[in-house]
């Protein structure tokens, strides 16, 4: 017998070992779920055509998966249990089933994913599975608190070492639930990230000691997956010693240029890297890495990033950094078959839009790029990247304004969490009734005189989707798309319009 599973029983009751099989049942359902995800991906590839109605064509909706798991755990939790007489058996079972789900939950966020999926595809499932796991653990903990209170033994039972280890994890889970709320997460993201990962590691380690019968097999699986993630990060990290930061007075956007390493594999358009401190710096292991979309194509000599200035992670040209990736963000099948496309982006979302636009420009029948920014000073990124294609630019602040206010920087996910930031340039704009003023600009100056030779079409005011996407709607084809990249508010507005006008839609969300 595994040493970790040989602890003598410390919870009373003759049903001590009755729940062991339920952990294996949950583990089995986890394997079935992974197989189901793979089947969906295979069917998606086989059935993908130019007339497909979108990426979610064969994917099961997230809420169905979560409801299914919730019903499975509740059903197994009370199955063959005479309530309320044997409720202790039930609360023990919820604790074991929660722990048995941990390997599956960690597996969902491996980077790169070992089953060939983009890890971002599984991030929402990971977040909700984490909530299901915590819910089961809380049922287990609250159940025992009630039992001990009724017995009058709350203090004596709580201070016992093995019980106390479980209480520590219980309290960490409660703290994590509170600070994971959007209000707190957006304001203290780094601390949320640290607490999140500490909770994961202690959940794996302390519950291995707390649980009886033992859960050694699950603990080994979890530790192996976490160890694999650390090894992958160490083995596949790239060092940076000559990072170049290009800024412009009055702009909140900066361009970061990294010399491309010849060993770096090609990446599909829209891919991203994760930038952090050197691996020898403790901060690279404690705090979250920072994901930035690659604004250049795989054929370019430089690896360019367009990012918002941040007080959380300030880049200095003379300092060393490290990064991992590139990680794919966009469906290869979609890029190969998509046609008739309007791309709309906000702020630093242009970093996602530019390479996708350049890629589609070579093969799509119709491609249009729309960019929303608060200040015309942000246009310096186009000049820096030598972008000379036609683009419609909406200046949503005062045309004469030299500042570009951004309330939140674009943070994202870490080892076991996916989060980014909400920074929508259109949120504080005039109403849609505000008249737009169109200006052609070639020199990025504030000269409002039309210049026919210019490819930058500048419009003051927020975009009117009806006018913006008018040419796309008129295309006589079912293979027409809107790609939105930026904050959730922009993406949701574009998605709603696309749905109402029967246009296919795909997005990249920047939010926290």
Curated annotation (Swiss-Prot):
What kind of membrane protein is this, topologically?
Multi-pass membrane protein
Instruction: List, alphabetically, the InterPro entries matched.
Output: FAD-bd_8, FAD-bd_FR_type, Fe3_Rdtase_TM_dom, Fe_red_NAD-bd_6, FNR_nucleotide-bd, RBOH/FRE
What's the EC number here?
Answer: 1.16.1.-
Question: Which spans are transmembrane here?
Answer: 20-40, 61-81, 97-117, 132-152, 161-181, 191-211, 218-235
One Pfam annotation reads Ferric_reduct
Q: Where is this region: Disordered?
A: 427-451
* EC top class named in words: oxidoreductase
* Polar residues bias spans: 437-447
Q: Which function does this protein serve?
A: Probable cell surface metalloreductase. May be involved in iron or copper homeostasis.
Q: What is this protein called?
A: Probable metalloreductase AIM14
* Protein source organism: Debaryomyces hansenii (strain ATCC 36239 / CBS 767 / BCRC 21394 / JCM 1990 / NBRC 0083 / IGC 2968)
